[in-house]
Amino acid sequence: MTILNHTLGFPRVGLRRELKKAQESYWAGNSTREELLAVGRELRARHWEQQKQAGIDLLPVGDFAWYDHVLTTSLLLGNVPARHQNNDGSVDIDTLFRIGRGRAPTGEPAAAAEMTKWFNTNYHYMVPEFVKGQQFKLTWTQLLEEVDEALALGHKVKPVLLGPVTYLWLGKVKGEQFDRLSLLNDILPVYQQVLAELAKRGIEWVQIDEPALVLELPQAWLDAYKPAYDALQGQVKLLLTTYFEGVTPNLDTITALPVQGLHVDLVHGKDDVAELHKRLPSDWLLSAGLINGRNVWRADLTEKYAQIKDIVGKRDLWVASSCSLLHSPIDLSVETRLDAEVKSWFAFALQKCHELALLRDALNSGDTAALAAWSAPIQARRHSTRVHNPAVEKRLAAITAQDSQRANVYEVRAEAQRARFKLPAWPTTTIGSFPQTTEIRTLRLDFKKGNLDANNYRTGIAEHIKQAIVEQERLGLDVLVHGEAERNDMVEYFGEHLDGFVFTQNGWVQSYGSRCVKPPIVIGDVSRPAPITVEWAKYAQSLTDKPVKGMLTGPVTILCWSFPREDVSRETIAKQIALALRDEVADLEAAGIGIIQIDEPALREGLPLRRSDWDAYLQWGVEAFRINAAVAKDDTQIHTHMCYCEFNDIMDSIAALDADVITIETSRSDMELLESFEEFDYPNEIGPGVYDIHSPNVPSVEWIEALLKKAAKRIPAERLWVNPDCGLKTRGWPETRAALANMVQAAQNLRRG
């Protein structure tokens, strides 16, 4: 029983983000479709060869996507919304881009599909749309073409296909409502056809991804798996693939399926290997997801070996990444600025392939010397002073319940704040950022590259802040912001100023489409060596008599949008960040800043996949926010901003944050989101976003007034604020001025009654 290794997928974008550049060039009309397709072919060939050279036995094919793999599956099945269809019924790459972006070099523009998070990762997928009576047919043969490509290059391949039940689970019904699960029998013939085509090509194994099997699914969805896989059996061997959680709760459903193997995530799941071995059919292959596909840490391979060695020789076994390596940067070797000690702790996608080769060889031979050598740096890390800060650990251990409580309840604080700020009814503000112009980005880049000295950089930033204050005063806004000209990214900026974080040069991961992010890495205990935002907030406040908000990114969001440590809990990291930012709140307050906003857009995103695990997460997530904010005096007003499409199921936790003001994204839902706050009888102040900043369209005064009147039917007017949905970083100044002028006018009209 020779053990093989494989990956579940590989990053698509290219080491230098070649795919992003090719996509954006094509969209802008600066290159041809053939030039774009050529970049895709080149990247796929390179990535297969790199994995092979790193020691991978079975190469994934079908993991490449021009925008998103769920969208690729939609096209494969012929699921193209009517508004995006070509007149002749054909499907091409521009069809795909129109669904993803709303427009493409050919075809008519139309509303893009909805985009949402891929399970609990920071990757996004395009939500499939289903209509009653929908027809499906094999339409987009990208998978088959890529299999042919890989076979022609002489590779041993394992095609990757998103499974039918998960695909339906991820979608939404449009128009007349019906049960989307009823479409299962309509899509299965397409899957059968694809598997038959793969069998014709001599394919032995197909990785069929069903990550929905780690969720707490309704019984009807669990029951759908058996008939679905009965229909798919017999043409090739199927590796039923799950990830992001364990499968034990749904193992009875899984073991009844006519598949030949199961992949489990042994990093994020709590499945016991011995128990899995006992319960799986003896002729099934077990693919053990031992190497973390969604973090950047070098694995302790001696631990991984011990985790799996007892079943070696007892069943067919593969070793694999826990999930697709899509969520990891590509290659650590090109990082030239990382400290040597810190660099020795990391493994990016190619290094993870090497780990799988080492693990496979040791399991086949019984010789673990290479595993011990590889694991030495990560074992040494446990005692590094770069990791452990006794002062932080002592402070964290000393936290009491009092540290997460404001001195008085909201009603008392609100009186003190009204007396201090004397704001009018319907107070107007913005969410924080103003347009990041070419001048601002060039200024920051020149400073970063060393082409600009610190004095000239600070003079430039000060000028942009001054301009933002002047603009806001001219517009008549009531509570101002400094505009965040000095900030590149709301998480990266804070990470750069906190001890315990490091940054990469090329650690890009795909977020969606052509958007890539370079998350900070938490390597050790987090602390704040010096004030971060105080200087610029104080400067902005000196330019005006109106209150200027201090702007912080909250602890849970910084955690969720970074690569976290693996040696301590997420709760520990969040609370360390909260303590560091608590000191920032105190310093802002001491500098005369009376309104402080702590953004937590990721609080809901961080929810565990299983609802039964939500309470524990929300408890420490809320506590981290409160630790951050509770140092504020009664007359300091704490704001928070959140952009979710669903609040109902976490309203208790939103209220428990005890922010004085919460601003939320509501314009696209026509204020429907406020229902949650009305039904809950939310006690504090709310700023429902009155226009969508993601669109360049300028809302009319009448439209904003109508939205605010609608809001006032749900929330008492004396507790309502007036603000856009989100920060204005991505907008231009002309539409920003026009939209804010109309927003201020609408508020003034309502004050006059």
Curated annotation (Swiss-Prot):
Cofactors required: Zn(2+)
A GO molecular function held by the record: 5-methyltetrahydropteroyltriglutamate-homocysteine S-methyltransferase activity
Keywords from the named record: Amino-acid biosynthesis, Metal-binding, Methionine biosynthesis, Methyltransferase, Repeat, Transferase, Zinc
Binding site for L-homocysteine: I431, G432, S433, E484, D599
InterPro entries in UniProt: Cbl-indep_Met_Synth_N, Cobalamin-indep_Met_synthase, Met_Synth_C/arc, UROD/MetE-like_sf
Annotated binding of 5-methyltetrahydropteroyltri-L-glutamate, by residue: R17, E18, L19, K20, K117, R515, C516, W561, E605
Catalysed conversion reaction: 5-methyltetrahydropteroyltri-L-glutamate + L-homocysteine = tetrahydropteroyltri-L-glutamate + L-methionine
Cofactor note: Binds 1 zinc ion per subunit.
HAMAP family named in the record: Meth_synth
Purpose: Catalyzes the transfer of a methyl group from 5-methyltetrahydrofolate to homocysteine resulting in methionine formation.
Protein name: 5-methyltetrahydropteroyltriglutamate--homocysteine methyltransferase
Gene: metE
